[in-house]
Structure formats: structure tokens, C-alpha cells
Amino acid sequence: TLQRCRDNEIKAVEGNEFLIGKDAAKVDYAIFNNETISRVHAKITKQGNEYYITDANSMNHTYVDGVIVPPGAPFKLSNMSKIRLSDEEFIFQKP
């Protein structure tokens, strides 16, 4: 799951590919009320029992536990990883 730190909204990460951004027509989790989030900002993928996040060449970057995620390069997520999309923070929890 992803927990949005701003308002504690919780969203289940489902499927093998999960898109995050502000364009509700293109993503699985639409982030509203934040203009710094790209239309399609990042993608979480599941491979076996592991989860990875990939920055979708966003304008304002993706970070995991304070480390920038290079665009297009999958970055392994751990349970309770802190994800930051631009200035929006989330906590990732493995199911």
C-alpha cells in the first residue's frame, strides 16, 4: 500500500504495474491538489515478491529514502520506504 503523508490517504498497490501521477485517465493512483506532480510521474512494478519504483522522466523527480531515482531505472523498494514524488511524500508498505 501507499500512504499519502499529507492526508493519510491509503491506496492499495495492485497488479504488476501501478502508475502514479495527476492524470486520472492514465494512472492507477491520481494525486490531486499538487501541480508539481507530473501527469504520469512514476511506476511501481512487482517482480516476484519484490517491488520497484521507476521515475517516468518526471519534471520534479522521484526519491526513495532521500535518494534520487534516475529516470527509467527501477529502484528497489523496501517495506516502509519513504517515497517522495516532487514534494509529496508517501510511505510504501509491502502487502
Model-predicted regions and their roles:
Residues 1-35, 45-47, 75, 82, ...:
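Intrinsically disordered, low-complexity acidic Ser/Thr-rich regulatory segments
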Residues 28, 41-82:
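Forkhead-associated
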Residues 38:
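Beta-rich catalytic cores
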